[in-house]
Amino acid sequence: LSAPPPLEIDLQIEPDGDGVRLTDGDTLVAVANLSEPLPRPSGTPVTFAEARAVGSAYEGLTEHPFSTCFSCGTAREDGLGLRPAAVGDDTGAYAAAWVPREVSVPIGWAALDCPGGWSAGIAGRPMVLGTMTAQLFALPEVGQECVVMAWPGASSGRRFESSSALYGPSGELLGAARAVWIAVNPAAVRPVGR
């Protein structure tokens, strides 16, 4: 991402070598390229019941820097409603219970997005997604009990890394992602010209 994507307006998609560029007029919003396959996560998912239970400790319930976020926002009824919270293990893992109301590739990516940010420490240090590399192996079915796991990675200055994984009701891996998050002032982060 190069700029916060404006919502509910048409953006332009332009070919760019082996990838595409997403623009809003003259403003570059995002670039997408193919990447090498991601390694399979080595962590073990918690159960759906365990993920649901830790959701009551979701830090975004008391203070959320972006409460209208589609994935994890608390002021968004049409969103995914993810409530990622620490599972209390020695890996720093976070988990979120998720029962999809609709399923698509963009929804799968959205499910893999924010849990990584919360595991990287977004509470008390607002961050936005800088880059995300994701791979979906399969999509869940509407109504299935899924778990999204996330783990913090390295950090340097304002840059924080995370990884996340989406698991189906039997613990099967449905998708994985790696992300870079950038610490920001949330009052200064908004779509250009809006």
PLM features per residue range, with description:
Residues 31-33, 105-108, 186-188:
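A short, polar/proline- and glycine-enriched secondary-structure boundary/capping micro-motif
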